[in-house]
């Protein structure tokens, strides 16, 4: 029996989001052993329990108040939301924040030799999918009638097997579609992982812990999106150099020993630093350019 005074978080047991969710919790300082095949794991340093479940069970666990928080793909969350609304329910939850992993898209795909000029091509066609409600929502908006073929896996084989004329499935790189003689023709939904919270009153201790976790998650995500930059630059071109490296705050400028025409600059930049940016910095006279990863940060 779970202790209801502890914060309960549901995450995917295995699969696309599992590794990223585990890494996020670890970088937030939650010490927990998720290596063993346990469905429930307990944090060593915080009053937190982790429930490891199937991804399509997570939205329901949050909406039904079984757990306090859930890390889930927006596609799975939206599908469950539409499913419950179709049954006359009024599901409640809060999306606390979008996360920086789990990116994918839900797309329509057809066989390579099939012509496609728009959603109207699918009029009265049979479409295989694991996301019938998201598919219906999209095609209803396009005024397209279709027949749904519900499959919980291996959706890509449906056209070759004669089960469907087209499919609607998650796409990451498109390699699986290509291997099955299919091509992506329409993106109907773009998704990332998100953190959701159950509806209803939350005890003050739990809410304080949630707020602490959100602050840490923000720091982890911001650190991953930022770099620590160190370089030497000509004093007269400093403004041009800074303009290439947007940051949350002004940089730290330090004098260089024995050289009054140049300075050392340190800053946290939110700009992804490509080779082109470094080449532009060099063309402005910058030298000794170092780009370092940031493990954690807090503003």
Curated annotation (Swiss-Prot):
GO terms for biological process: L-histidine biosynthetic process. Its EC number is 2.4.2.17. Keywords: Amino-acid biosynthesis, ATP-binding, Cytoplasm, Glycosyltransferase, Histidine biosynthesis, Magnesium, Metal-binding, Nucleotide-binding, Transferase. It is found in: Cytoplasm. The keyword Glycosyltransferase applies. Feedback inhibited by histidine. GO terms for molecular function: ATP binding; ATP phosphoribosyltransferase activity; magnesium ion binding. It is an enzyme of class 2 (transferase). One of its GO terms (cellular component) is cytoplasm. It catalyses: 1-(5-phospho-beta-D-ribosyl)-ATP + diphosphate = 5-phospho-alpha-D-ribose 1-diphosphate + ATP. The keyword NADP does not apply. InterPro entries: ATP-PRT_HisG_long, ATP_PRibTrfase_cat, ATP_PRibTrfase_CS, ATP_PRibTrfase_HisG, HisG_C, N-reg_PII-like_a/b, N-reg_PII/ATP_PRibTrfase_C. Pathway: Amino-acid biosynthesis; L-histidine biosynthesis; L-histidine from 5-phospho-alpha-D-ribose 1-diphosphate: step 1/9. Catalyzes the condensation of ATP and 5-phosphoribose 1-diphosphate to form N'-(5'-phosphoribosyl)-ATP (PR-ATP). Has a crucial role in the pathway because the rate of histidine biosynthesis seems to be controlled primarily by regulation of HisG enzymatic activity. PANTHER family: ATP PHOSPHORIBOSYLTRANSFERASE (PTHR21403:SF8), ATP PHOSPHORIBOSYLTRANSFERASE ATP-PRTASE (PTHR21403). Belongs to the ATP phosphoribosyltransferase family. Long subfamily. This is ATP phosphoribosyltransferase. It comes from Pectobacterium atrosepticum (strain SCRI 1043 / ATCC BAA-672) (Erwinia carotovora subsp. atroseptica). The lineage of its organism: Bacteria, Pseudomonadati, Pseudomonadota, Gammaproteobacteria, Enterobacterales.
């Amino acid at each position: 029996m779970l202790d209801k005074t502890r914060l309960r978080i549901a995450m995917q047991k295995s699969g696309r989001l599992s590794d990223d969710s585990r890494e996020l919790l670890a970088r937030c300082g939650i010490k927990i052993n998720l290596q063993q095949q346990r469905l429930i794991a307990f944090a060593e340093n915080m009053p937190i329990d982790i429930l490891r479940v199937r991804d399509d069970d997570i939205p329901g666990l949050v909406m039904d108040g079984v757990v306090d928080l859930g890390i889930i793909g927006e596609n799975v969350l939206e599908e469950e939301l539409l499913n419950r609304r179709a049954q006359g329910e009024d599901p409640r939850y809060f999306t606390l924040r979008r996360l920086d992993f789990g990116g994918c898209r839900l797309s329509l795909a057809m066989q390579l030799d099939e012509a496609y000029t728009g959603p109207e091509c699918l009029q009265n066609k049979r479409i295989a999918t694991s996301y019938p409600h998201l598919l219906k929502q999209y095609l209803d908006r396009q005024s397209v009638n279709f027949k749904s073929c519900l499959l919980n896996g291996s959706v890509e084989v449906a056209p070759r097997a004669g089960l469907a004329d087209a499919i609607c499935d998650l796409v990451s790189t498109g390699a699986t579609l290509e291997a099955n003689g299919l091509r992506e023709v329409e993106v109907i939904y773009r998704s990332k992982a998100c953190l959701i919270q159950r509806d209803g009153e939350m005890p003050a201790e739990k809410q304080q812990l949630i707020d602490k976790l959100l602050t840490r998650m923000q720091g982890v995500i911001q650190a991953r999106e930022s770099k620590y930059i160190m370089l030497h630059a000509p004093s007269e071109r400093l403004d041009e150099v800074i303009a290439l490296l947007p940051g949350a705050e002004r940089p730290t400028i330090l004098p260089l020993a024995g050289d009054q025409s140049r300075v050392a600059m340190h800053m946290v930049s939110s700009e992804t630093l490509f080779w082109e940016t470094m080449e532009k910095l060099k063309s402005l006279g910058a030298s000794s350019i170092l780009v370092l990863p940031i493990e954690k940060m807090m503003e």
